[in-house]
A protein has these predicted regions:
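Conserved AMP-binding A3 loop
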Residues: 13-16, 111-139, 269
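Conserved AMP-binding/adenylate-forming
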Residues: 27-70, 155-158, 353
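Flexible, low-complexity linker/hinge segments
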Residues: 89-111, 138
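Conserved AMP-binding/adenylation subdomain of ANL enzymes
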Residues: 135-152, 160-200, 210, 214
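Gly/Ser/Thr-rich phosphate-binding loop
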Residues: 198-203, 212-274, 287
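AMP-binding/adenylate-forming catalytic core of the ANL superfamily
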Residues: 201, 294, 300, 306, ...
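AMP-binding/adenylate-forming catalytic domain of the ANL superfamily
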Residues: 409-432
Length: 451
């Protein structure tokens, strides 16, 4: 049974959740759900998701966390679960038996199966986490942050993503309370932080990029609220932005790094040991290494058992327990890790390899820019040209940005096109949806790139 309080805004849902867990557990038991069965949870609304998740745990079934998907039937074909939980009208949870799976081979220590973020135009993969890895993540993350029983944590992202699942693990390990914001309006967030005595906040860059302008506008310092740590997953915030945040709140934003395949946390900044512009130091027990092209490799107790599909767990991509992350990174002499960008995101411009994350970090230092994403627009002879989608002040012009970065990056790294937009599209885990932006750029600038 769930061992912590749950609030939406200032309203407690704990009693309702516990009651519905009991009811769903009885219903699942009546349907024949038993230990080791795979139960797909195709729910995105947080309260109903918690009910289904903990009902699975009561019966020692293995949750297969699908979350919000457009084509559920296709996902069910991939995961080959024994049962599926979903919500009908008015968030009523349904449990349905699926066709009998005759052939399935998954390790006996599988504790959970979750999916990678995918994108709006890409199919996600499913990852099997071990019971031991889940326990390791709970214990090590608790050790890093010093969480205490009864403290309250505000979380703004989906619980069914890898980030959310790690938060749920920490909450149950420490009997901490979960606060889900009723909305993301800055004034409402501050009210909830005050009334709920929130100690920890976990979110993504878009949350902080919304909050900081409000704090400046209202000239509102929030040191007195008492938040111990502001965590950030997804993409990195700039050094300048974090400094401005500290000026207004008195507490740094703690960037970290993880990926679903690693269980998820790999490296974290600590409240007592952090370095701006980095993702902190690896967890104790987590090993990291670098290939010749600076790709980051990880080995830890929580690295996935393998990718799961069609009743099988495939661990062929692991090499003696080492996971290729696909991210380029460095580690300095003090042990802090810096993520340079995704290897697969590299854009070839006139024969040069350009990291869009490097260009983005440079552009973000402009005082009038809140966020940016850079993608490639195909060109028949030059490989690609760069297009920067910029979120910034209304007075911002393309010439302003060009002049700002002219002497800061080499010529291949300078965008040919700029598009000023109100906000960047994001995936459920808070990361920028680059596939969507690339599709927009090709439609908007594809013909222009031919000249």
């Amino acid at each position: 049974m769930i061992n912590y309080e749950v609030f939406v805004g200032n309203t407690s849902y704990t009693a309702l959740i516990k009651q519905e867990i009991q009811q769903l557990t009885l219903c699942m038991n009546h349907q024949g759900v038993s230990a080791g069965n795979l139960v797909a949870i195709a729910i995105h609304e947080p309260i109903s998701w918690l009910v289904a998740y903990y009902a699975c745990k009561e019966l020692e079934a293995v949750p297969v966390v699908i979350g919000k998907v457009a084509e559920l039937d296709k996902q069910l074909e991939i995961v080959r679960a024994d049962y599926v939980c979903y919500t009908s009208d008015h968030y009523k949870i349904q449990i349905e038996s699926l066709s009998v799976v005759k052939e399935r081979n998954i390790p006996s220590n599988t504790g959970l199966i979750c999916r990678t973020s995918g994108s709006t135009v890409g199919m996600p993969k499913y990852v099997a986490w071990s019971k031991e890895g889940i326990t390791y993540q709970k214990q090590e993350t608790t050790r890093v942050f010093g969480y205490k029983e009864g403290e309250r944590l505000l979380f703004t992202l989906p619980l069914w993503g890898a980030y959310g699942l790690s938060i749920v693990g920490v909450l149950e390990h420490n009997s901490m309370d979960l606060v889900i914001p009723a909305n993301l309006r800055p004034r409402s967030i501050i009210t909830v932080l005050e009334k709920q005595n929130v100690c920890w906040v976990e979110s993504a860059p878009f949350f902080y990029q919304t909050m900081l302008p409000y704090l400046f506008k209202e000239q509102r310092g929030i040191e007195e609220i008492g938040v111990k740590g502001w965590g950030c997953g997804g993409d990195l915030l700039t050094h300048t932005f974090v400094q401005q945040w500290v000026e207004m709140t008195g507490v740094p934003i703690l960037d970290g790094y993880g990926l679903t395949e690693a269980g998820p946390n790999v490296s974290l900044n600590r409240p007592y040991d952090y370095c701006y512009g980095t993702v902190g130091k690896p967890l104790s027990g987590t090993e990291i290494n670098f290939s010749e092209d600076r790709e980051l490799w990880v080995r830890s107790p929580s690295v996935m058992l393998g990718y799961y599909a069609n009743g099988q767990v495939d661990a062929s991509m692991l090499h003696n327990g080492w996971l290729s992350t696909g991210d380029m990174a460095t580690r300095d002499e003090h042990g802090y890790v810096t993520i340079l960008g995704r290897k697969k995101n590299i854009i070839i411009v006139n024969g040069y390899n350009v990291s869009p994350e490097y260009v983005e970090r440079t552009i973000r230092e402009h005082p009038g820019i809140r966020d940016v994403a850079v993608v490639g627009v195909p060109h028949p002879t030059r490989g690609n040209r760069l297009c920067a989608f910029v979120v910034g002040d209304a007075s911002l012009t393309k010439r302003d940005i060009d002049l700002f970065i002219k002497d800061k990056v080499d010529e291949p790294s300078r965008p040919s096109f700029y598009e000023i937009i109100p906000h960047l599209p994001v995936l459920p885990n808070g990361k920028t949806d680059r596939n969507q932006l690339k599709a927009i750029a090709e439609v908007r600038f594809g013909q222009e790139s031919l000249v």
